[in-house]
Amino acid sequence: MARAKYKKNSRGEYETKVWDGTYTPDGFKHRIRLVSKKSSADLERQVNEIRYRVEHNEYVVESDIYFIDYARDWLQIRKASKRTNTQTMYDNIIEKHLAFLNDVRLCDIRNMHFQMAINNAMDKPRTCQQIYITFNQIIRRAVADNLITSHDAELICMDINLPKYQKKEKRALNEIEKLAFQECMNNGVLTAREKAYLTIIYYCGLRRCEALALSRFDFKKEGGGFYLSVSKDLVFVKNDPLVENKTKSDRGLRQVPVPAPAAKYLQQYITSLPGTNLFYCQNSILITKSSYDKMWMSILNKLNTAAGGSKKFPVIDDLTAHIFRHNYCSNLCYKIPAISIKMIAKLMGDTEKVVIDVYNHVMEEKEDVQTVLEDALNM
């Protein structure tokens, strides 16, 4: 005769504890009490049922937590290691675009709520993408936390209609912008700080966050030339600057050669600095967002004037720092095969795929399809 797996307690009940798929605040497995007055076999059936449901994400712990509270906890706990800009993006989505769900419990969330969040921002396609990513991740995490079932998650996230998002095409400097840049760099209209910033993003192709984080110790001489050591980013938390001792990715850690004309000016600029940071403002050892915005607007106004434009009728008004970075990459791509795609990616602190995309765009501009076809098909 088979021996009973579970024994009766003092009350004559078959009793055990089983893990419900969650954890205590201390990180231990949370176990629930199961009881059967019938038999050990009945209790074993209950145990196996719960274990199966936990294993297949079908077991749900009863909880009255509100969706918005869970979303905030998710951001604080699950995204703590992400870059500040990424955390800010998630926080913006939760507080501005999901806050209308503040009185809805997580267990009551439905597909309708997801679609409503998208519909409320339908005129902002990129924001809708971010809402979709955030909402979807929160729901998937709730499944892992046994707060909703995987089946419910599929129903919540299925058939969400998003507006069509057309990613803005990256571009290099156009001819008008190049001429205006050269004139401003040579005629003395730029402040020392403005000229230093343009020098770095034009001649070295650094991201804005990388350039603003530079200190005098990042400008180094090695052998017969100079280079910039890129190892950190400066991001803005609202208006306040914050230096992160990491780059956008591991590839961002690099040393970028500084061409001779740029090195000569940066040497002069650095000797005039009162502190260690290349870019700062009067009330801060680091540049604030408002100070940066004023500097960039001043640069745009001077470039626009050099191009023959005015405030009322601007010739240059959509220029961004990232366009200078794309221009740097494009100029290097024109030199292939004298320089390899792999080396360009290394200098950019980016992937080879990004460089290949830029290279393909450069080649498209140079292609004479009609002539090539006639030559290729000439019998």
What residue ranges belong to the model's regions?
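N-terminal DNA-binding module of tyrosine recombinases/phage integrases
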Residues: 9-13, 22-112
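Conserved tyrosine-mediated DNA breakage-rejoining catalytic core shared by Y-recombinases
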Residues: 16, 214-268
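N-terminal core-binding DNA-recognition domain of tyrosine site-specific recombinases/integrases
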Residues: 39, 75-147, 167-169, 189-190, ...
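Basic, Lys/Arg- and aromatic-enriched nucleic-acid-binding interface segment
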Residues: 129, 144, 148-150, 154-212, ...
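Catalytic-site neighborhood detector that most strongly recognizes the C-terminal catalytic loop/helix
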Residues: 164, 172, 348-372
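Short, basic (Lys/Arg/His-rich) helix/loop patches that form interaction surfaces
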Residues: 183-191, 256, 271-277, 284-285, ...
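Short, polar N-cap/turn motifs at the start of nucleic acid-interacting alpha helices
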Residues: 219-227, 338-358
